[in-house]
Amino acid sequence: MDRQNIRIRLKAFDHRVLDHSTREIVNTAKRTGATVRGPIPLPTLIEKFTVNRSPHVDKKSREQFEIRTHKRVLDIVDPTPQTVDALMKLDLSAGVDVEIKL
């Protein structure tokens, strides 16, 4: 019989919020009897933006800003129906993007 997997990808700008949400998902899955692989940290995406400090002159004077997107992956192996229900009812922090694939 084919093994059922649930893959959960989490993205957030703040790594502390991301780790807290990951811990909540892992604890919920383990409490309902499923096995969890991960969390696996994926490479952090760093987007840098360079802008002129002055609107008029001084082209050499610039300022840089960056956005860091932290990512994690979890695999839930052989989830029970209770696991799926508990994950659907789970309320995660704002600012965490969750993608679920079956």
Swiss-Prot record:
Signal peptide positions (record): none
Keywords noted in UniProt: Ribonucleoprotein, Ribosomal protein
Keyword Ribonucleoprotein among record annotations: yes
Transmembrane segments: none
Gene Ontology terms: cellular component: ribonucleoprotein complex; ribosome
SUPFAM superfamilies on file: Ribosomal protein S10
Gene Ontology biological-process entries: translation
Family matches, as Pfam families: Ribosomal_S10 (PF00338)
GO molecular-function terms, A-Z: structural constituent of ribosome; tRNA binding
Gene3D superfamilies, alphabetized: Ribosomal protein S10 domain
InterPro entries assigned to the protein according to its UniProt record, in alphabetical order: Ribosomal_uS10 (IPR001848), Ribosomal_uS10_CS (IPR018268), Ribosomal_uS10_dom (IPR027486), Ribosomal_uS10_dom_sf (IPR036838)
Family per record: Belongs to the universal ribosomal protein uS10 family.
HAMAP family on file: Ribosomal_uS10
PANTHER family per UniProt: 30S RIBOSOMAL PROTEIN S10 FAMILY MEMBER
Subunit (UniProt): Part of the 30S ribosomal subunit.
Function noted in UniProt: Involved in the binding of tRNA to the ribosomes.
Name of protein: Small ribosomal subunit protein uS10
Native species: Caulobacter vibrioides (strain NA1000 / CB15N)
